[in-house]
């Protein structure tokens, strides 16, 4: 590797809006403020909700439902 052409790789502090603080390595050179992290994101906490209440197939089946069928 060539010398003196690579950015400095330093330890910084990433602070989430939920209060979680993480020490990470980065070339950014300054501390970061995060909106979400793995401690408060709905996908990782299991508190996610289903936003899609029906797709195109459900709309088709609803529109062309045959009387007497399931």
UniProtKB/Swiss-Prot annotation:
The keyword Protease does not apply. One of its GO terms (biological process) is translation. Binds 1 zinc ion per subunit. Its cofactor is Zn(2+). Keywords: Metal-binding, Ribonucleoprotein, Ribosomal protein, RNA-binding, rRNA-binding, Zinc. InterPro entries: Ribosomal_bL28/bL31-like_sf, Ribosomal_bL31, Ribosomal_bL31_A, Ribosomal_bL31_sf. It comes from the Bacteria. One of its GO terms (molecular function) is structural constituent of ribosome. One of its GO terms (cellular component) is ribosome. Zn(2+) binds at residues 16, 18, 37, 40. HAMAP family: Ribosomal_bL31_1. NCBIfam families: L31 (TIGR00105), PRK00019.1 (NF000612). Belongs to the bacterial ribosomal protein bL31 family. Type A subfamily. Binds the 23S rRNA. Part of the 50S ribosomal subunit. This is Large ribosomal subunit protein bL31. It comes from Proteus mirabilis (strain HI4320).
């Amino acid at each position: 590797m060539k010398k003196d052409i690579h950015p400095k790789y330093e330890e910084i502090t990433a602070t989430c809006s939920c209060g979680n603080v993480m020490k990470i390595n980065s070339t950014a050179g300054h501390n970061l403020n995060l909106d979400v992290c793995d401690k408060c994101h709905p996908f990782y906490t299991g508190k996610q909700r289903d936003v899609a209440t029906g797709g195109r197939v459900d709309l088709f089946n609803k529109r062309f439902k045959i009387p007497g069928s399931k």
